[in-house]
């Protein structure tokens, strides 16, 4: 069962799947809030390698948001008005635990 559209099977190698680069991204996504850290880690594990450049750009912009906003959006307490962020939030929340 696929949980996000970015898990599509492709014959191409992802452009950024080198362990060092992925580790830097994991470090950048750390928030010190267990819920957020878990959601970001699941996205990076399940979707990042196959994500398009546009999807990656949205994720990188998403990381620049304030932690309290990220938490409210991802926990469903507040609706994000940015359509690209809203799509990412749906994807992240649908990933398996």
UniProtKB/Swiss-Prot annotation:
InterPro entries: SDH (IPR005631), SDH_sf (IPR036714), SdhE_FAD_assembly_factor (IPR050531). Transmembrane segments: none annotated. One of its GO terms (biological process) is succinate metabolic process. Its main location: cytoplasm. GO terms for cellular component: cytoplasm. Keywords: Chaperone, Cytoplasm. It holds the Pfam family Sdh5. SUPFAM superfamilies: YgfY-like. It is found in: Cytoplasm. PANTHER family: FAD ASSEMBLY FACTOR SDHE. An FAD assembly protein, which accelerates covalent attachment of the cofactor into other proteins. Plays an essential role in the assembly of succinate dehydrogenase (SDH, respiratory complex II), an enzyme complex that is a component of both the tricarboxylic acid cycle and the electron transport chain, and which couples the oxidation of succinate to fumarate with the reduction of ubiquinone (coenzyme Q) to ubiquinol. Required for flavinylation (covalent attachment of FAD) of the flavoprotein subunit SdhA of SDH and other flavinylated proteins as well. Belongs to the SdhE FAD assembly factor family. This is FAD assembly factor SdhE. The lineage of its organism: Bacteria, Pseudomonadati, Pseudomonadota, Gammaproteobacteria, Lysobacterales.
